[in-house]
Amino acid sequence: MPTLKLIGLGLSAKFVTREAIDEISKCNVVLFESYTSLSCDINLDFIKFLNKNVIIVDRKFIENNIKEIIKLLKEKEDVCIVTIGDPMIATTHVSLIVEVKDKGYNFKVIPGISVHCYIISKSMLSSYKFGKSVTITYPYNNKIDTTPYDVIYDNFIRGLHTILYLDLKEDKIMTAKEAVELLIEMEKIKKQGLVSDDRIIIVGQRLGCDDEEVVALRLKEVFNYKFKEPPHIIVFPTDKLHFMEVEALKCLMK
């Protein structure tokens, strides 16, 4: 029976599993998502090396063309949706699987290493102390979305760390410096004392690549620090730290 396969490639080519390679190679139609994340060496050419029948798709295609995907399955073709990282981080994929299963078709999930799990490991903070994650987005119509501040604050007062994803647009990628600038502006609006000069954050840069870097910095140090090229990701730790977490942060400080 035709099968919908959700395949994660991990953060870079060295993390691509044998199972992922095998499934992509034998798939009838490969849809490569270009909007979920960036990789230093996974691109269209990489996917085409495994399978020539590749179509680059964006978020709108997956959300708005479920019927087209069902049609491909009806034509007795396996369909592979390939993503950088892990495929099931996106809720769109969950709804797609539910729809496909409801139509009587099979599905298969091939996990990949996600930036979520990766930065938790690299931060060396206690994995069970991470709360809800949130994305810092660019202002829209000159208005800043302060939702990230609210999420960080709620986690912070409960002794939980926050992972901050940074906005990814077709024409630009948010940097750690831009994200901190927005957090400072949010502080001016919210005035809860959360974002201050001496607050420590962890910044992951080009995770999974050979030149990756993970560093702990005080906010006042961010603007003079020479970061690597994006993608970046930020961890905003709580101040309710176990003594071993304190020592771990010291290991990441320059």
UniProtKB/Swiss-Prot annotation:
Return one Gene Ontology term, BP aspect. Answer: methylation
Reactions this protein catalyses: 2-[(3S)-amino-3-carboxypropyl]-L-histidyl-[translation elongation factor 2] + 3 S-adenosyl-L-methionine = diphthine-[translation elongation factor 2] + 3 S-adenosyl-L-homocysteine + 3 H(+)
Domain of life, source organism: Archaea
Which EC class is the enzyme in? transferase
Enumerate the Gene3D superfamilies for this protein.
Cobalt-precorrin-4 Transmethylase, Domain 1, Methyltransferase, Cobalt-precorrin-4 Transmethylase, Domain 2
The record ties this protein, via SUPFAM superfamilies, to: Tetrapyrrole methylase (SSF53790)
A family per Pfam: TP_methylase
Q: Where does S-adenosyl-L-methionine bind?
A: 11, 86, 89, 114-115, 166, 207, 232
Gene Ontology MF terms in the entry: diphthine synthase activity
* InterPro entries in UniProt: 4pyrrol_Mease, 4pyrrol_Methylase_sf, 4pyrrole_Mease_sub1, 4pyrrole_Mease_sub2, Dphthn_synthase
Pathway named in the protein's UniProt entry: Protein modification; peptidyl-diphthamide biosynthesis
Keywords of this entry: Methyltransferase, S-adenosyl-L-methionine, Transferase
Q: What is its EC number?
A: 2.1.1.98
Q: Which CDD domains match?
A: DHP5_DphB (cd11647)
Return the similarity comment: Belongs to the diphthine synthase family.
Q: How does it assemble?
A: Homodimer.
Q: Give the protein's function.
A: S-adenosyl-L-methionine-dependent methyltransferase that catalyzes the trimethylation of the amino group of the modified target histidine residue in translation elongation factor 2 (EF-2), to form an intermediate called diphthine. The three successive methylation reactions represent the second step of diphthamide biosynthesis.
The protein in question is named Diphthine synthase
